[in-house]
Amino acid sequence: MQKVVRDSAISQSEEKLIQKVQKGFKGSLYTVLKAGTETAAGTNLQICLANLWAKLQKYYEDEDVSPVYFVNPQDVADYLGTAQITMQTAFGFTYIENFLGLGTAIVSPQVEAKKPIATAKENLRGAYVPMSGDVAQTFNLTADTTGLVGMTHSTKTGNATVDTLLMSCVKFFPEFQDGVFVGTISGE
């Protein structure tokens, strides 16, 4: 019984810690995206995203790219009202495929309301150390389901605790900052 309770407590703590680590590296991506140097505007979400799409088409004119938009959930709710949409989740990101026929929309409260962001999926880069490689072996880490966060536990008999070490070496960034467009929804 004690082992089950202990394992459950450790597992729940791990999940919360991993979520915090993932939120940190996602937050750093949003910070970089918010610093996009190009702009577009519209009176509502659909017009703003359409104008962002047009800017992407011009910027990436000679390239075959897939647009991706980052949108605040309140903007999506205000626009859609009671419409039926299907949201999906991968690596902690909530997204809608083919949103308004323009591309993938990632929905996050870390995006400022009325300030959607657009770039090409191909402009997004990631650098990371896999948590199943040499570093992980050195510290005896077990990778989470994404492979981006590693963890290990050690017991401390002096104060009867279980310490958890989490390690993550992840950085997401746009390759071209001027290929990131920040929209403004001005209202009607």
PLM-predicted stretches and their roles:
Residues 1, 20-27, 82-90, 117-119:
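Short low-complexity stretches enriched in small and charged residues
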Residues 1, 5, 62, 72, ...:
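Alpha-helix initiation/capping motif
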Residues 24-44, 111-126:
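Unusually extended, aromatic-enriched hydrophobic runs near protein termini
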Residues 1-41, 159-168:
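Long, contiguous amphipathic alpha-helices that act as assembly "spine/axial" helices in icosahedral shell
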Residues 35-105:
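Extended, solvent-exposed, turn-rich assembly/linker loops in the middle of proteins
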Residues 90-188:
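Sequence/fold signature of self-assembling virion shell proteins
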